[in-house]
């Protein structure tokens, strides 16, 4: 039978979620910690977004459901330990990788690599759930791989290390590699969600991921785990161990860093809530297309906020990924409609045949 029509409200809810998520990377760029290390700045953001998720999600869920803390605990137990802990771990991996990559390289590079997520989701579904992968998805994967190679080629171009809006060659390359973890971990996360019980709720897993991410960030910062050491950082011997967890004081930037940190923590939670609500009625291929709004607008907002201008290689690779994923999403939607039409025709023929037999 033909697929049911998608309610306009569901589409608008998904679009609203993508639009709310779009400023996330610009807010991340505006968030400055009291450290000169991009590495420790990233973990400071992981700390606040992790514990923010832990603090915000359970109350929001309970208010939306009109439930009690005991009911939230029951939902967590019903989800099962494997999906609760596995989902939390996978979400933590992609979240940490995204924040670290975004602080080491161009936002446009990270978002372009992240946009390949639907392709990886298809391959994960085939590997773990036995779902078929259409030919146009394989073609899109090859084209996107070529575009990502263009992004990586930019990392080997010499650039100045003294420009805070232009990542150094080493950071740029490492950031691109770390960004590859994000769509892979997300693909496994969505596969875990799909393999869970039909009446299961993944919100407890997201809340637990906040505890894992926040605790991990605390260990990295307090344990003084190094990755990169800028010259400015080495010169600043008075820098506190807790500096990565302390946003720039309002006296220095007018409160921009603190406002950006609070806003991004709230906006990401709201954005994924809206996207989840919309995805109940909107086909997954169409949701993937809607999510490309962030790739199209995110780099522009970062440029407007902090003046970060990627090179032409980054723009070329990002444009290639955007065009390829748009074509792939449209092809997937067309496949769903053709399958729906075929089912409708078969049902109509069976109904007509049954009516004829009855009349005879």
For the regions a protein language model found, what residue spans apply to each?
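Specific transmembrane alpha-helical segments of multi-pass solute transporters/efflux pumps
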Residues: 20-25, 64-109, 114, 150, ...
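Helix-helix packing/entry segments at the starts of transmembrane helices
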Residues: 48, 108-118, 193-214, 264, ...
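Hydrophobic/small/kink-forming positions within alpha-helical transmembrane segments
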Residues: 22, 26, 88-96, 118-123, ...
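C-terminal transmembrane-helix exit sites in multi-pass transporters
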Residues: 117-142, 296-315
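Loop-to-transmembrane-helix transition segments
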Residues: 9-17, 69-97, 174-182, 238-270, ...
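Glycine-/small-residue-enriched transmembrane alpha-helix faces in small-molecule transporters
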Residues: 1-47, 97, 159-195, 340-343, ...
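Hydrophobic transmembrane alpha-helices of multi-pass small-molecule transport proteins
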Residues: 57, 136-155, 183, 313-332
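Transmembrane alpha-helices of multi-pass small-molecule transport proteins
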Residues: 38-93, 120, 143, 184-192, ...
């Amino acid at each position: 039978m033909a697929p049911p029509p998608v309610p306009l409200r569901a589409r608008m809810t998904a679009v609203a979620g993508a639009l709310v998520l779009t400023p996330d990377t610009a807010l991340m760029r505006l968030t400055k910690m009291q450290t000169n290390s991009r590495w420790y700045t990233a973990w400071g953001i992981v700390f606040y977004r992790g514990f923010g998720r832990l603090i915000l999600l359970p109350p929001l869920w309970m208010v939306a459901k009109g439930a009690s803390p005991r009911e939230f605990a029951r939902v967590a137990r019903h989800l099962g330990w494997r999906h609760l802990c596995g989902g939390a771990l996978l979400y933590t991996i992609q979240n940490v990788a995204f924040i670290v990559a975004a602080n080491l390289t161009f936002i446009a590079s990270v978002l372009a690599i992240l946009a390949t997520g639907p392709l990886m989701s298809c391959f994960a579904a085939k590997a773990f759930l036995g779902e078929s992968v259409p030919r146009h998805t394989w073609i899109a994967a090859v084209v996107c791989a070529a575009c990502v190679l263009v992004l990586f080629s930019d990392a080997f171009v010499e650039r100045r290390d003294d420009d805070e809006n232009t990542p150094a060659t080493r950071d740029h390359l490492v950031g691109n590699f770390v960004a590859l973890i994000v769509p892979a971990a997300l693909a496994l996360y969505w596969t875990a969600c799909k393999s869970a019980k039909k009446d299961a709720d993944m919100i407890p897993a997201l809340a637990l991921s906040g505890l894992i991410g926040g605790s991990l960030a605390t260990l990295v910062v307090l344990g003084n785990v190094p990755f990169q050491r800028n010259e400015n950082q080495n010169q600043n011997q008075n820098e506190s161990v807790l500096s990565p967890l302390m946003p720039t004081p309002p006296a220095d930037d007018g409160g921009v860093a603190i406002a950006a940190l609070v806003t991004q923590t709230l906006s990401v939670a709201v954005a994924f809530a809206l996207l989840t609500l919309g995805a109940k009625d909107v086909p997954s291929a169409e949701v993937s297309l809607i999510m490309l709004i962030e790739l199209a607008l995110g780099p522009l907002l970062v440029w407007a906020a902090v003046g970060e201008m990627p090179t032409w290689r980054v723009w070329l690779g990002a444009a290639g990924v955007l065009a390829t994923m748009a074509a792939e999403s449209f092809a997937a939607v067309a496949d769903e409609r053709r399958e729906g039409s075929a089912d409708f025709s078969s049902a109509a023929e069976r109904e007509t045949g049954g009516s004829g037999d009855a009349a005879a």
